């Protein structure tokens, strides 16, 4: 019985991810997800307690999917600056290719699970994509002897790359090529590092 329960829970998560991926979070329905899993509409609530908790679990899985996309093709032993440039390009590509997932991860829900203080940004949920980005950004801080606080560095870098991704996926950014994205991220990091050192 426990195995069937875990299998159903995983199926509910994967069907929810596919629903978000194809239709967006605004059109996601717990009833539709239950129906696609062949269970009653109350089953998701039995396993997750509430729609909010279900979305939080789905967000954790989506963040892992985002992490895999963000670090794809990147050697983690290279310097943090180069990693951030490559991660930035992957981030923008993700925004273009996975529009609904980008929307749910970076526009609709991320700040429900993050806390900002004067010192840093912390998460109160498992968001491996953000946690990896944070670790590389803070590694850059150490490698370049940057004097800004952790929170300032994270806010500046995260808001820049998220903003760039929004621009590139809009009609304004249709002419942006991957080379342009890489050059833009590299230039931003150069300006930031030279201005902060």
Predicted regions and their residues:
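Amphipathic alpha-helical segments used for helix-helix packing
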Residues: 97-117, 166-174
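Short hydrophobic clusters on alpha-helical segments that form packing/core surfaces
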Residues: 12-20, 62, 66, 70, ...
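Amphipathic alpha-helical packing segments from all-alpha helical-bundle domains
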Residues: 70-71, 75, 116-142, 151-155, ...
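Hydrophobic/aromatic residues within well-ordered alpha-helical segments
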Residues: 51, 58, 62, 66, ...
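Amphipathic C-terminal alpha-helical segment
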Residues: 97, 157-176, 191-197
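Basic, helix-initiating cap at the start of DNA-binding domains
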Residues: 1-23, 27, 31-32, 36, ...
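Short hydrophobic/aromatic patch on the recognition helix
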Residues: 38-48
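Hydrophobic alpha-helical connector segments
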Residues: 57, 71-100, 153-157
């Amino acid at each position: 019985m426990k195995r069937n329960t875990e299998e159903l829970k995983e199926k509910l998560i994967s069907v929810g991810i596919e629903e978000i991926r194809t239709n967006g979070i605004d059109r996601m329905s717990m009833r539709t997800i239950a129906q696609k899993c062949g269970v009653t509409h109350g089953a998701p609530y039995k396993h997750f307690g509430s729609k909010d908790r279900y979305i939080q679990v789905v967000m954790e899985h989506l963040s892992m999917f985002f992490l895999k996309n963000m670090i794809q093709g990147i050697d983690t032993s290279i310097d943090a600056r180069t990693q951030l440039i490559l991660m930035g390009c992957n981030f923008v590509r993700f925004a273009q290719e996975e529009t609904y997932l980008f929307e749910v991860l970076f526009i609709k829900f991320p700040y429900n699970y993050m806390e900002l203080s004067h010192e840093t940004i912390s998460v109160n949920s498992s968001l491996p994509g953000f946690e990896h980005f944070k670790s590389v950004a803070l590694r850059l801080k150490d490698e370049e002897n940057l004097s800004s606080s952790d929170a300032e560095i994270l806010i500046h870098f995260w808001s820049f790359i998220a903003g760039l991704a929004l621009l590139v996926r809009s009609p304004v950014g249709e002419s942006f090529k991957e080379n342009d994205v890489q050059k833009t991220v590299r230039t931003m990091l150069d300006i930031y590092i030279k201005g902060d050192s």
